[in-house]
A protein has these predicted regions:
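Conserved SAM-binding loop
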Residues: 12, 37, 96
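Conserved SAM/SAH-binding beta-strand->alpha-helix loop
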Residues: 16
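S-adenosyl-L-methionine
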Residues: 23-59
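A short SAM/SAH-binding and catalytic strip from SAM-dependent methyltransferases
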Residues: 54-75
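Conserved class I S-adenosyl-L-methionine
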Residues: 66-71, 95-114
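A short glycine-rich, Lys/Arg-flanked "PGG" loop and its adjoining helix->strand segment in the class I
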Residues: 74-93
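Class I S-adenosyl-L-methionine
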Residues: 109-176
Length: 176
């Protein structure tokens, strides 16, 4: 995206440096001055952005955290939406591209529960043939998933003006 849109900044955020390596290498080789990377835990993201500083978020093939009790780690969980709400501009979009049906449905449910505005909702984005930019940009992982004949889903939404409601933590039962 940084190649095509020179007048905007793009910042990749991940805790694992190896996932950002290729992008950083390309940005250096092509002298893309509008591309940067943060190797941080996502829970610390508020340290790096001021209120209203971010125009848009792209969440591309994140860990879906499918094991029991791990949904709170999904990047579209209300606790993260509440964080994003603190630095996104009003009306800014959050975009999720994933091969995980569970994460996709979780996100749809969360978006509905939080009264977010849905701009685009696409199941199996490649079902009707080639897709337009920027959805046509494929990551390494997306290529692997497509080779496995997995369906790629996409949702784009905006957060509501009212604060995101974070559900209470579930108590463990019987010492579990």
């Amino acid at each position: 995206m940084g190649r095509q849109i020179k007048d905007k900044n793009f910042i990749g955020v991940d805790v694992k440096g190896n996932r950002m390596y290729n992008g950083a290498k390309i940005a250096l080789q092509e002298q893309l001055t509008n591309v940067g990377f943060l190797r941080i835990q996502i829970g610390n993201i508020l340290t790096y952005f001021a209120p209203g500083e971010v125009d848009e978020i792209w969440i591309i093939f994140p860990d879906p955290f499918l094991r029991d009790g791990k949904a709170k780690n999904r990047l579209t969980h209300p606790k993260f939406l509440a964080m994003y709400q603190q630095f996104l501009k009003p009306g800014a979009r959050i975009n999720l591209k994933t091969d995980s049906p569970e994460l996709f449905q979780f996100t749809i449910d969360t978006v509905q529960e939080q009264a977010c505005k849905v701009h685009t909702l696409q199941h199996d984005i490649y079902a009707k043939g080639p897709v337009e930019w920027p959805l046509s940009i494929q990551t390494y992982y997306e290529g692997l998933h497509l080779a496995d004949n997995r369906k790629i889903n996409f949702i784009s939404f905006s957060l509501p003006d009212k604060p995101i409601v974070i559900p209470p933590k579930k108590k463990k039962e019987d010492g579990q």
